[in-house]
Design a protein with these regions (language model features):
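Active-site beta->alpha loop and helix N-cap motifs at the rims of alpha/beta catalytic domains
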Residues: 1-80
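Catalytic alpha/beta core domains of metabolic enzymes, predominantly
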Residues: 64-65, 78-184
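Interdomain hinge/lid region at the active-site interface
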Residues: 188
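GST superfamily/GST-like fold recognition
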Residues: 197-198
Length: 200
């Protein structure tokens, strides 16, 4: 509610409402929708190691229960489960499921997902240092950690990618590599919050 009030319609607000409990994730999603969120970011159920059929059911139940777009979040290093390309293809049939923040680092799966899913199912990089590579495979940009500290640079990188200027995007991506690594020198979000604190 505080974020929605502060933004005051100037930008879309996407609320993170994921949980390893379908019931809890649905309740959080409905609360966020009531608070005015424009969309929802839903991580895969962590710890439980759901099957692909279980993931489909989990996300479909939540998508059925709200009237705002959902972005799925695949981050197997944190959750212990990966969303398969075929699972994305099934979930993409739901009108409220619009894309994925892909932080799995599996470029073969990303290619297969792009081939199996309709064009309006968006893929965003979930790893700053993979932004250009994912955009080359049909991604739409990045849901970024680094942009909290270097917004102009990450905006420029995304613009170059969306213009298909991958020569310039690749150079900028390489220039940002050390900074991207520094933002993960400890468990996220400790480094980025420390950097923001240093910036005042």
């Amino acid at each position: 509610e505080c974020c929605v009030d502060h933004v005051d319609g100037r930008l879309p607000v996407i609320a993170g409402t994921g949980s390893n409990s379908t019931e809890n994730a649905l309740a959080l999603s409905r609360d966020a929708e009531r608070a005015g969120a424009d969309g929802l970011l839903l991580v895969t159920p962590y710890y439980n190691k759901a099957s692909q059929a279980g993931l489909i059911r989990h996300f479909q139940v939540i998508a059925d229960g709200v009237d705002v777009p959902l972005i799925l979040y695949d981050v197997p290093s944190r959750t212990g489960v990966t969303i398969a390309p075929e699972t994305y293809a099934e979930l993409a049939k739901h009108p409220n499921i619009n894309g994925v923040k892909e932080a799995g680092g599996n470029f073969s799966n990303i290619q297969k997902t792009r081939n199996l899913c309709p064009e309006d199912f968006s893929i965003w990089s979930g790893n700053d240092d993979e932004t250009a590579a994912i955009c080359m495979l049909g991604g739409k940009g990045v849901i970024s950690v680094v942009a909290n500290v270097l917004p102009a640079e990450m905006h420029r990188l995304t613009e170059l990618c969306l213009r298909n200027d991958f020569a310039a995007a690749g150079k900028l991506q390489l220039d940002l590599k050390d900074f991207c690594d520094a933002m993960f020198c400890d468990v996220n979000p400790i480094p980025v919050k420390t950097a923001l604190n240093l910036l005042g």
